[in-house]
């Protein structure tokens, strides 16, 4: 009886061991499947996050480039503003300068008028010096070739002593501020 009992116990132990082994295998299989599913889900999440990161990095780089462009444009605008700051004042003073030139072109025998003209000439010269300090200069005209960038042709001439397209007379002086024309010269051009 004890042998039977031992056999039964051994058999029960073997069955129990087999069930445990079977359960272990099932658990391992389930764990492997779960791990594979988890890995696949995690890889998908990683891929999604990497794509989002790339997108954010690209947006950041574009924004940084835009910022640099705005910065450069601002510097260029500021430099141009500084360079041409006196343009508006010069444009406002040009009619007065023209009036000075017309007044100085008159002559008189009266001593008082000569003194006034001398004072006006001094003021006129001071304005020219101030213009020169700001980079404002007269556009050369008579004897030069006509250039539509600097001259405005208002009359034509037929002078045999002048070359073709040469300026023969200046009706109104032109001025430029550094490389920018403030007012073109009004000229008479030979055919």
Curated annotation (Swiss-Prot):
Domain of life the protein comes from: Bacteria
Subcellular localization: Cytoplasm
Disordered: annotated segments: 1-40
One cellular component term from this protein's GO annotations in UniProt: cytoplasm
Single annotated GO MF: adenyl-nucleotide exchange factor activity
Main location: cytoplasm
InterPro entries: GrpE, GrpE_coiled_coil, GrpE_head
PROSITE patterns reported for this sequence: GRPE (PS01071)
Its job: Participates actively in the response to hyperosmotic and heat shock by preventing the aggregation of stress-denatured proteins, in association with DnaK and GrpE. It is the nucleotide exchange factor for DnaK and may function as a thermosensor. Unfolded proteins bind initially to DnaJ; upon interaction with the DnaJ-bound protein, DnaK hydrolyzes its bound ATP, resulting in the formation of a stable complex. GrpE releases ADP from DnaK; ATP binding to DnaK triggers the release of the substrate protein, thus completing the reaction cycle.
Record note on quaternary structure: Homodimer.
UniProt record similarity statement: Belongs to the GrpE family.
Name the UniProt record assigns to this protein: Protein GrpE
Organism: Listeria innocua serovar 6a (strain ATCC BAA-680 / CLIP 11262)
